[in-house]
UniProtKB/Swiss-Prot annotation:
Coiled coil: none annotated. NCBIfam families: PRK00092.1-2. It holds the Pfam family DUF150_C. The gene is rimP. CDD domains: YlxS_C. GO terms for biological process: ribosomal small subunit assembly; translation. The keyword Phosphoprotein does not apply. This is Ribosome maturation factor RimP. It is found in: Cytoplasm.
C-alpha cells in the first residue's frame, strides 16, 4: 500500500509552508458530523498571525487542488497550534526543554496513562520529564500524544 493521505498531504504542503518562513507543526484530517476537515497547524518564532494563516490557506489550497490527494470534499482550516502545541518531532523536544508538558500513553505505563512534568528532553528513545525532583522516562513507542501545557 502507498502513502497515507496525511503523508501525501504533508509532502505536498510542507515545502510551500517552509518557503514562507513557517513551520508545519501538524496536520489533521477528521470527520465532524457530516463534514470532513483538513486542519493545518503552522508556527514561527514569535507566533503566527491571521495574515500568515490566510496566506498559507491560499497557497496550500492551490497546491492541494493541483495534486488532489483527497477525493472527497473537505473544509480547509489553517491556524496556530495554540498554547497546547503538540510535540511530535525530535526538534520539538529540544526546542521546548524546560517547558511544562503533558504526555498521554497508548497503554498503562508504571500505573498511569497520563504524565505531566517539565521536559528534560528526548534521551535515546524516551521522553524524559521531571516533576517534584523525580525523573520519569516514558518510551516514545507507547506515547499517544505529547503537548505543551500550562499552569494556572
Amino acid at each position: 500500500m502507498g502513502e497515507s493521505i496525511m503523508e501525501q498531504v504533508e509532502a505536498i504542503i510542507a515545502p510551500v509552508i517552509t518557503e514562507q518562513g513557517l513551520e508545519l507543526v501538524d496536520v489533521e484530517y477528521v470527520k465532524e458530523g457530516a463534514h470532513w476537515y483538513l486542519r493545518i497547524y503552522i508556527d514561527k518564532e514569535g507566533g503566527v498571525d491571521i495574515d500568515d494563516c490566510t496566506n498559507v490557506s491560499h497557497l496550500v489550497s492551490e497546491v492541494l487542488d493541483k495534486h488532489d490527494p483527497i477525493a472527497q470534499a473537505y473544509m480547509l482550516e489553517v491556524s496556530s497550534p495554540g498554547l497546547e502545541r503538540p510535540l511530535k518531532k525530535d526538534e520539538d523536544f529540544e526546542r521546548f526543554t524546560g517547558k511544562l508538558v503533558r504526555v498521554l500513553t497508548k497503554e498503562v505505563y508504571q500505573g498511569y496513562k497520563e504524565f505531566t512534568g517539565y521536559l528534560v528532553g528526548l534521551i535515546e528513545d524516551d521522553i524524559v520529564l521531571e516533576y517534584e525532583k523525580e525523573r520519569m522516562a516514558i518510551p516514545r513507542a507507547i506515547v499517544d500524544k505529547a503537548n505543551l501545557t500550562f499552569e494556572f
